[in-house]
Amino acid sequence: MKLYEYQAKTVFSEHKIPTPKSILIQKEDTNPEVKSVGFPSVVKAQVLSGGRGKRGLIQLVKNENEALYQVKRLFEIEPSMKHLLIEEAVHIDKEIYVSITVDAPSGKAILIASESGGVEIETLAVEHPELIIKEPIDLRYGLLSHQARHIAYQMNLSVNQTKQMIQILMNIYEIFKKYDAELVEINPLFATKEDTLIAGDGKIMIDDNSVFRQPRFAQTETDYSSEAAYEASLEGIPFIQFDGDIGLMCAGAGLTTTVYDLIHYEGGTVANYLEFGGPNYKKAVKAMEICLKVPSKVILIVTFGTIARADVMAEGIVEAIKKLNPDRPIVTCIRGTNEAHAVELLKEAGLTPLFDTEEAVRTAVRLAKGEKRWVFLSIEKPKCVSKASRVVKEAFGPNIW
C-alpha cells in the first residue's frame, strides 16, 4: 500500500525529519486557507501516481490569486482527488536522493543515496549508475551508525548538514522497520541555503501483507480510484486500472507483465492488470466480476498453472461466465497442471481455448480493434467465427470468443 505524500510527511515529522511548513486542503473546502504558509508556495496534487511535475500537478504560486486558481484547476483535472498539499517554497542549494528499500535476492534491506536527487532513480541508474551509492543493511542488526556516516560523508554537504543527514538516515530506517515498509524514499531531500536539510517529497510503501498491522492507514472506498480497485483490494487481488481496451486476468506477476508487454507490442492497449494466480487462483469469479467493472472491449485470460492447477482455474472461469453472463468477448489461454481437463471444461462452456500466449494476445488485440472476422481455435487451424459462433451463442450469447 502506497501512502500519499501528506501521509508520508506526517510520519517524517513524527520521526524528526524536517518537512516544509504546509497545509492540507480538502476538496470540499469552499474557502481554503491558501495564505497560511505564505508566498511563494507550492501547490501539490495528492495522487498516488508518479510524474506529477511532468503532468503539471505541482505548481509554484506567488500570491493568493494564483494559489486559488491552481487549487481549483488541480481539483478539476483530477476529479477523484480528495486532497491538495500547499507547502512553503524552500531556498534550495542542492537536491539529494535517499531511500531504504527491500533487496529480496539478498534477504536484506538496502540504503540508496545520490547527490543527484530530484530525478527518477530508475533513469539515473541507467544513465549515470556511478552517481548512486548503495549500502546493504543486515536486518538482524539494522542500520548501523557507521553505515549512515559512510553515506552522509559522500554527499558533499556542510558539517552541519552532514550531521543532520546521518540522523535523517537513521530515522528513515526506524520508519522502514516500524511500518513494515517496502520502500521509504525522500526525493528530493533539499539542502537549503540556510544550511538545513528538508524533505521535499516523500514516499512510503507498506507491505500489503502487513497492512493489517498499520490500522492508522486503513483506507476506505473513497481512497481508491474506482470501485473495481477497491474491491480488488478487499480481496487481496493485485489490480491496476488503465484506460485501454483489453482487460487482463493472468496468473502471477511475471506472466501478467509479459502479457501486458505483448499487448502493447501487438498494438493493443490494456484496460486493467489483474493477477489471480498464486493464493488467488480460486477467485476466478471475483476476478472476472472486477474485470467487468472496467470499461474494456475484451477480456484476455492467460494462465500457466503449476501449484495453481489449470483445471481449478478453468472451473472458476466457467462458473464466472455462467454466473455473470459477460457482455464482451473472452479469449482464454490456459496451460499447466491438468491442462487437458481445463481445456475440456472451457470447450464445454462454449469457449475456444488457445495454446499459445502470443496467439491469444493477437486475437484479443484484433477483437478489441473490431476485427471479428477470425477467431483462432488453435495455432494451426484458424476457422471462421461464424462456424463456431452457433454453439457459443446457444450457451452464452454471441460475445464469448
UniProtKB/Swiss-Prot annotation:
Molecular function per GO: ATP binding; metal ion binding; succinate-CoA ligase (ADP-forming) activity
Transmembrane segments: none
Enzyme class, broadest EC rank: ligase
Chain ranges of the ATP-grasp domain: 9-217
Enzyme Commission code: 6.2.1.-
Highest taxon listed in the record's lineage: Bacteria
Subunit structure: Forms a complex with SqwL.
Function: Part of a variant of the sulfo-TK pathway, a D-sulfoquinovose degradation pathway that produces sulfoacetate. Hydrolyzes sulfoacetyl-coenzyme A (sulfoacetyl-CoA) to produce sulfoacetate and CoA coupled with the phosphorylation of ADP to generate ATP. Cannot use succinate, acetate or 3-hydroxypropionate, and shows only residual activities with malonate and 3-sulfopropanoate.
Protein name: ADP-forming sulfoacetate-CoA ligase subunit SqwK
Origin species: Acholeplasma sp
